[in-house]
Amino acid sequence: MKFVNHIEPVAPRRAGGAVAEVYAEARREFGRLPEPLAMLSPDEGLLTAGWATLRETLLVGQVPRGRKEAVAAAVAASLRCPWCVDAHTTMLYAAGQTDTAAAILAGTAPAAGDPNAPYVAWAAGTGTPAGPPAPFGPDVAAEYLGTAVQFHFIARLVLVLLDETFLPGGPRAQQLMRRAGGLVFARKVRAEHRPGRSTRRLEPRTLPDDLAWATPSEPIATAFAALSHHLDTAPHLPPPTRQVVRRVVGSWHGEPMPMSSRWTNEHTAELPADLHAPTRLALLTGLAPHQVTDDDVAAARSLLDTDAALVGALAWAAFTAARRIGTWIGAAAEGQVSRQNPTG
């Protein structure tokens, strides 16, 4: 598939079973099959759960689609993911929110009068516990928190597996393409969809405590519980690698990693030599996806020797970091509610 590196997604013409169902749903509701979704297809369980978290956060619910695209675009910009920024700003044009799109593309804050401004500021700051307060109430918190966590997850995978952008040409041509894409997808962005449709093929799973922020929305909670269970039980990464990554991510507070990727060496040194490369790749994917090189991926292939194993390992690492972010933005949002509604 064009634009995808290191793996071969399932081609639409060869898709069957749940993969074909997800592809059809995505085309119907997005207007096309997005590469960041197709890249999950070597692992059918990951694709079905990943589609559910994507759909139930971004495409349905009380919060307007355009507002969620602004949140997703701001998260993408904070991670310096050009593909993601191009995709979400195109959808902002489709939603008619051109000022928000222009500000994010320019790397500036939206104007004070832009209704999306506080949401963009919040989303841009979700990468650290010191971000601005949430500008939303508890009735829609799961939608906003889920959108932010979803795109902290997906953007990390995109940075490793996809080209820098899908737009051809230079800046002027790319801007024209974004606006043209906005016209193409305008009807899809404004369409309303019924919550929960993507979760019907998922088995019920227990929602982990660190994802408790999703509880108020049954479809979002079901989707994230399924994704968490699938990634945590997949066999692709051995327990010693998972233990190291969980420990390092668990002590991370959003600070940028050193510019040299040698920071991983102190964490892999304790492991057997054959686990150094996959552990390094997992650490980089979660905490410094820009530092992942083709050589890093190739070196990890000795253990991650299938496309399903590679995408599953990368997804687990990316989701581990996104879950960590979810703990602090979820706690901050809950704390705001507690302060606004004191008891006693």
From Swiss-Prot:
EC numbers for this chain: 1.11.1.-
Primary enzyme class: oxidoreductase
Variant or mutagenesis effect after changing residue 49 to P: Abolishes interaction with PknI
Residues annotated as the enzyme's active site: 84 (cysteine sulfenic acid (-soh) intermediate)
GO cellular component term of the entry, any: plasma membrane
Entries under Pfam families matching the protein: CMD
Important for interaction with PknI: annotated segments: 49-50
Coiled-coil portions: none
InterPro entries from the UniProt entry: AhpD-like, AhpD_core, CMD-like
Changes seen on gene knockout: Disruption mutant is sensitive to oxidative stress and exposure to toxic transition metals. In a human monocyte (THP-1) cell infection model, mutant shows reduced uptake and intracellular survival and increased expression of pro-inflammatory molecules, including IL-1 beta, IP-10, and MIP-1 alpha. In a guinea pig model of pulmonary infection, mutant displays growth attenuation in the lungs. Knockdown of the gene leads to increased sensitivity to peroxides such as cumene hydroperoxide and hydrogen peroxide.
Keywords from the UniProt entry: Oxidoreductase, Peroxidase, Virulence
GO MF annotation list: peroxiredoxin activity
Activity-regulation annotation: Interaction with PknI increases the peroxidase activity by several folds.
Record's function text: Involved in protection against oxidative stresses. May play a significant role in maintaining the cellular homeostasis during stress and virulence of M.tuberculosis. In vitro, catalyzes the decomposition of cumene hydroperoxide (CHP) to acetophenone.
Quaternary state and interactors: Interacts with the serine/threonine-protein kinase PknI. The PknI-Rv2159c interaction is mediated through phosphorylation independent physical interaction.
Miscellaneous comment text of the record: Though the Rv2159c protein is a peroxidase, it does not form disulfide bridges between the two catalytic site cysteines.
NCBIfam families cross-referenced by the UniProt entry: ahpD_dom (TIGR00778)
Similarity comment text for this entry: Belongs to the AhpD family.
The protein's name in its UniProt record: Alkyl hydroperoxide reductase Rv2159c
Organism expressing this protein natively: Mycobacterium tuberculosis (strain ATCC 25618 / H37Rv)
